[in-house]
């Protein structure tokens, strides 16, 4: 958004009907037949270093809070209620602190309390933790310039342990993201960012 303290995201997941699916009719097998749309938002309550250099950033966020009923009709439903499509509903309060290592990079430490209320999944109220390291070598060679686009990540998201990386190709406008969810399930993609400010 145009406000540095507010982040809003729209996620559209295309659903592929696999051959032999018992949910989708046979004529749709092998095709993308549906989509799941979700919004998320993060509100920065406190900026890192506002009061003292050591103070962390504090963020309040939500993912996939409501959807239209899966049977049509246009009514809004939330969380694990009957008829919802909220497969990623969660609310969280997060704290983040970054430490700079001159001519090497920046280490981020993150902790949150998460309330998960997604449809068809275990509901939980528990902490999550993460860490990342973004390289920041002096740009004296092509290798150090290339390494500076790399951000290594690891997390416990209140349900699973995940490891991955993000690589920025062009000034944080185009990023490659890859992850092993629960240490074994690969997911990846390209992220295109539009900076409004």
Walk through the language-model features, giving the residues of each.
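Active-site cradle of extracellular carbohydrate-active enzymes
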Residues: 88-91, 96-97, 106-116
């Amino acid at each position: 958004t145009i406000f540095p303290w507010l982040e809003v995201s729209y996620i559209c997941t295309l659903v592929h009907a696999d051959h032999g699916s018992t949910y989708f009719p046979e004529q749709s097998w092998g095709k993308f037949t549906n989509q799941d749309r979700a919004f998320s938002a993060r509100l920065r309550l406190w900026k890192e270093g506002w009061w003292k250099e050591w103070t962390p950033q504090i963020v309040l966020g939500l993912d996939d809070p409501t959807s239209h009923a899966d049977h049509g009709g246009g009514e809004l439903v939330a969380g694990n209620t009957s008829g919802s499509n909220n497969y990623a509903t969660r609310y969280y309060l997060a704290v983040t602190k970054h430490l700079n290592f001159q001519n090497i990079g920046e280490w981020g430490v993150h902790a949150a309390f998460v309330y998960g209320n997604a449809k068809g999944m275990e509901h939980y109220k528990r902490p999550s933790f993460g860490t990342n390291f973004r390289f920041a070598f002096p740009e004296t060679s092509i290798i150090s310039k290339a390494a500076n686009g790399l951000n290594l990540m690891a997390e416990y998201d209140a349900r699973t342990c995940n490891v991955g990386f993000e690589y920025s190709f062009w000034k944080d406008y185009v990023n490659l993201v890859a992850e092993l969810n629960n240490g074994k399930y690969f997911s990846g993609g390209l992220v295109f960012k539009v900076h409004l400010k």
